[in-house]
A protein has these predicted regions:
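Short acidic loop-to-helix transition motifs that present clustered carboxylates
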Residues: 131-134, 184-188, 211, 322-323, ...
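Short, solvent-exposed loop/turn segments at secondary-structure boundaries
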Residues: 111, 158-159, 191-192, 400-404
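N-terminal small/polar loop signature for handling phosphorylated ligands or for N-terminal nucleophile
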Residues: 65, 87-171, 305-317, 324-332
Length: 516
């Protein structure tokens, strides 16, 4: 999916209205999408509760199910207008609705004022929020859904104390929250929290998804993201460029019937140290399970028997002391993965630098391979062949990456542009950044993957897809997606607490089969 900035959305809305679509019409459609989502959320809550009530108490003849309740928090701008319209629609659908504005933040735009009038004409009321009022608190706690329509994509400055009190009321209620366009308090372009932000269970975003819904704290606070078509013609954004996107995997290419192992990619993996022998094995299995034809595990001689004893399909080989021989062996591969379980020995670090300086093949750097180039960034800048780095935040900082502003997306893009490398910044919503300014945000994966060895599997998968000849702009984000999807399949079967990287490995073929 293409992810939009606040400026782009402002321009797209302007074009739509200049093209003859009234702002009130857009607002009405946005509100309808919000009301539909509120109904769905209420059904999800009420169904198990109603079933339990009936099983225990039964339903007296003629008695109706309890009326559904919503508390709608409206801000001063057009996001608030969406809220007023949503409140009216829910009221007309039989909900008990109370709508609130924050002291000093009455509706200011013409469209928001009109929607507030329409709500009142329909029998609704607009009240001033008093977050410490026991009656308001009691109503809030009794609701099926809280609707956040305080601020939308235009927010640029931290929330003031009045708005923070409203946000705190929503977050502390324990009631499902539905956000209009973006959770209030989230910066649209970065996902940063501006003073405080709503913890939404679901966000209905309009026309196009926004960057801040998928990166930074916004990726956590947005909950499930639903994109609503509110009637803005595609022509209003077809000339726009969207360098930031979520990963859309597409279909895998069909393999020719006469293909053989040498044509399916040769992956060379350098790693393994005492106490870290599992890392290259996991990387090798990740490469094989994602389609590599041949995998070589080059490990120090003293751990060779351990690694060789754990390999069936991969070929283990002991490293010699001559860097030229290691280089010659690596040159026979399609791609090299340097670092899984490599350890911190200076000899191994020098070997990594030697390969980077002389190997004319794509290189994936992970784990201790990344630590080896810390302080030697010029080696990366000097490479002519493709280089992919796969750090987590700690490794990224050791490489010189700047996360001080808390904007992982911008930090990843800056580093990729500076070094000429593809950067896979691992973590929640892994970011794959390219030197030309494009970035892909991954939405697959789950907390069960937060265990040692998962990153080794990913490194093997990235190397595998590159070795099979997929173009880098597809291979790298696709590997990240498949890694997360395999983790999701493992979690569905085993749960998030007990799954291991080898469980993830077993699910890679199933994740890939979904794309065949």
């Amino acid at each position: 999916m293409e992810l939009a900035t606040a400026a782009q959305m402002k321009e797209i809305d302007r074009r739509a209205m200049e093209g003859g679509i009234p702002g009130l019409a857009l607002m009405e459609r946005a509100a309808r999408a919000m009301a539909d989502q509120a109904e769905e959320m209420a059904r999800e809550i009420a169904a198990p509760l109603d079933a339990h009530h009936l099983s225990v108490f039964g339903m007296p003849d003629g008695e109706k199910k309890p009326q559904r309740r919503a508390m709608v928090f409206c801000g001063p701008g057009n996001n608030g207008g969406d809220g007023f319209a949503c409140a009216r629609l829910l009221l007309q659908r039989g909900w008990e609705v109370r709508t609130f504005t924050v002291t000093g933040f009455a509706p200011r735009t013409e469209d928001a004022q009109e929607m507030a009038r329409q709500l009142q004409d329909a029998g609704g009321t607009v009240e001033e929020l008093a977050p410490t009022d026991p009656k308001q608190i009691s109503f809030c706690l009794s609701c099926h859904v809280l609707v956040d329509a305080l601020f939308g994509v235009g927010l640029k400055r931290p929330l003031g104390w009045e708005m923070l009190a409203a946000v705190s009321m929503m977050n502390g209620a324990g009631v499902p929250a539905l956000a209009a366009d973006i959770p209030s308090g989230i910066e649209t372009d970065t996902g940063r929290v501006l003073g405080g932000a709503v913890n939404a269970d679901c966000t209905v975003t309009f026309t196009l998804p926004k960057i801040g819904l998928f990166v930074g704290e916004g990726g956590v606070r947005a909950g499930k993201v639903r994109v609503a078509d509110i009637g803005v013609p595609r022509a209003c954004w077809q000339e726009e460029k969207f360098p930031i996107q979520t990963v859309e995997p597409g279909k895998l290419p069909r393999r020719p019937r006469d293909i053989y192992k040498g044509k399916c990619g040769k992956v060379y993996i350098l790693g393994g140290a005492i106490g870290l022998t599992g890392a290259p094995v996991l990387a090798g299995e990740g490469a094989l399970r994602s389609g590599a034809g041949l995998v070589t595990l080059a490990v120090p001689a003293r751990v060779y028997p351990i690694v060789a004893g754990r390999c069936m399909e991969a070929m283990a080989t002991p490293l010699g002391s001559d860097p030229r021989a290691v280089l010659a062996q690596a040159e026979e591969s399609s791609v090299a993965l340097l670092g899984p379980g490599l350890g911190g020995e200076n000899r191994m670090k020098r070997m990594v630098l030697t390969l980077l300086e002389n190997l004319e093949k794509p290189v994936v750097l992970d784990a201790d391979g990344l630590n080896a180039v810390s302080g030697h960034i010029d080696v990366l800048k000097g490479r002519k062949a493709l280089t992919i780095l796969t750090p987590h935040d700690g490794e990224f900082k050791r490489l010189g990456g700047d996360l001080s502003e808390g904007t992982r997306l911008q930090a990843a893009l800056s580093f990729a542009a500076e070094t000429g490398c593809i950067l896979v910044l691992k973590g929640f919503r892994t970011i794959t950044a390219f030197p030309d300014g494009r970035a892909f945000v991954n939405v697959s994966g789950n907390p069960g993957m937060a265990t040692g060895g998962s990153g080794d599997v990913l490194g093997g998968m990235v190397a595998s897809l590159l070795g099979q000849g997929l173009p880098p702009e597809w291979a790298v984000p696709l590997a990240v997606y498949l890694h997360g999807r395999a983790g999701d399949l493992a979690a569905e079967e085993l749960g998030e607490y007990g799954m291991l990287p080898r469980d993830l490995i077993q699910k890679i073929p199933y994740a890939m089969k979904e794309l065949e």
